């Protein structure tokens, strides 16, 4: 069973080297056409996000706590429309896994629909599920499209997808490695039947959100092919490669402007699941040198027999939430922005547990990694006369998920999380400015608050 190793995952986070064909195509894209092309990808993804919101059933789907993304043929992220940045940097792991292990059997073909939610293979936790579609033009693989969303039911030992009492992955319900769930642009009925068994507490919502992901990814595919028909495949390939290079150059410039040094931050949890416990949820040593940053988590507490463990790429996802909201706020959402950033995870810590570990409540530990990152960058930036005014306090843990299960007023089965209470939480203050009482969600800066009544 080729579960990707930590080394593979961290390598797949980085952009792949440009192929000779990509370099040739990128050199032919004029600057004016490049700027227009970038905006076209923005429009494609924003339209697909609107489709996603309107076709989803779960609260998080309707709220826009989701992401729609476009990738190169090799799996590198080049742009996205985000309610949340949580999935932004890590989805290339899934695509590159498919390319490495499944290219020949079962094969990658036009009209395929791939699906996954397993954190062992590059996800966050099993409620966060993603549909992916390859974009082919006359037999040539040009790109990939994806749609990711948290669906609050997985058939676990508790309703709501994040069982607090789970002690291993075998109590968390659906954990699906990357699998082909559709061919010839149709979802397979046998998979829908298999999938719905895990969503028996709320089957209509479960299946509706799956279909919403698939139709959203397909909308991106269709619009990209329209651009190909208008400008040619070479232009699209060159545009995406140039977007990768431009994003990386911007990230290098921003990182280089930060002060060099070592900056530490430690964040504790006072409980693990139902058990009071003092846990060093994140011990971060952040080293900034020139145009590179290294995150080292030596000193973090060991993994524990609960669902409060985090696989390494999920930690990176939480860090991406901070980076894109604050440091890279004006850069494209692209794999190449993380090219100058390295991660070191000691084996056996709560942020790099055994493959059997439960991780369904990983977000509550992952958020502490985001808070530690926030605090470390605050120390770094506060030492700079040019940057100290931009320092913002971390949003805190925001551990107030309200999960419910039962029957709606229409007597339909429901298992969901009430997103309106999450998407209206507070944001930290600056040194010269108050915080915000109702800013958004620490995991989703742009989510809505529907059905608050």
Regions found by a protein language model. Give the residues of each.
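Glycine/proline-enriched, intrinsically flexible loops and inter-domain linkers
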Residues: 2-110, 115-137, 141-453
């Amino acid at each position: 069973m080729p579960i990707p190793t930590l080394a593979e995952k961290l390598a797949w986070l980085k952009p792949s080297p440009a192929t000779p064909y990509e370099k040739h195509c990128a050199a032919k894209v004029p600057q004016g056409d490049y700027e227009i092309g970038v905006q076209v990808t923005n429009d494609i993804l924003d339209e697909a996000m609107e489709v996603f919101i309107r076709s989803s059933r779960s609260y998080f789907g309707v709220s826009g706590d989701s992401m729609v993304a476009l990738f190169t043929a090799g799996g590198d992220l080049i742009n996205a429309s985000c309610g949340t940045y949580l999935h932004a940097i890590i989805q290339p792991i899934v695509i590159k896994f498919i390319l490495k292990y499944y290219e020949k059997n079962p094969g990658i073909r036009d009209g395929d629909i791939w699906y996954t939610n397993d954190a062992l293979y590059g996800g966050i936790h099993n409620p966060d599920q993603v549909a992916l579609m390859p974009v082919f033009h006359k037999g040539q693989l040009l790109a990939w499209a994806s749609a990711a969303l948290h669906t609050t039911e997985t058939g676990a030992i508790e309703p709501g997808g994040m069982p607090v009492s789970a002690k291993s992955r075998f109590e968390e319900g659906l954990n699906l490695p990357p699998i082909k769930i559709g061919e010839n642009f149709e979802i397979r009925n046998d998979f829908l039947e298999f999938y719905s068994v895990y969503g028996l507490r709320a089957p209509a919502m479960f299946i509706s959100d799956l279909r919403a992901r698939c139709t959203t990814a397909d909308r991106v595919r269709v619009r990209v092919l329209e651009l190909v028909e208008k400008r040619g495949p070479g232009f699209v390939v060159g545009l995406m490669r140039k977007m990768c290079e431009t994003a990386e150059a911007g990230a290098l410039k921003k990182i280089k402007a930060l002060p060099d040094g070592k900056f530490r931050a430690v964040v504790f949890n006072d409980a693990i699941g139902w058990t009071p416990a003092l846990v060093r949820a994140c011990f971060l040593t952040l080293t900034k040198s020139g145009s590179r940053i290294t995150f080292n988590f030596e000193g973090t507490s060991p993994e524990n027999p609960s669902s409060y463990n985090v696989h390494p790429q999920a930690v990176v996802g939480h860090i991406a939430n901070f980076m894109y909201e604050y440091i890279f706020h004006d850069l494209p959402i692209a794999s190449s922005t993380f090219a100058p950033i390295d991660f070191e995870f000691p084996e056996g810590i709560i942020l790099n547990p055994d493959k059997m570990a439960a991780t369904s409540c990983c977000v509550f530990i992952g958020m502490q990694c985001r808070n530690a990152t926030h605090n470390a960058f605050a120390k770094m930036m506060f030492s700079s006369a040019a940057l100290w005014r931009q320092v913002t306090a971390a949003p805190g843990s925001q551990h107030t998920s309200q999960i419910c299960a039962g029957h709606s007023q229409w007597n339909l089965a429901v298992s969901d999380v009430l997103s309106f209470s999450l998407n209206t939480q507070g944001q930290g203050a600056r040194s010269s400015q108050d915080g915000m009482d109702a800013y958004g969600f620490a995991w989703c800066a742009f989510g809505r608050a529907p059905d608050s009544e």
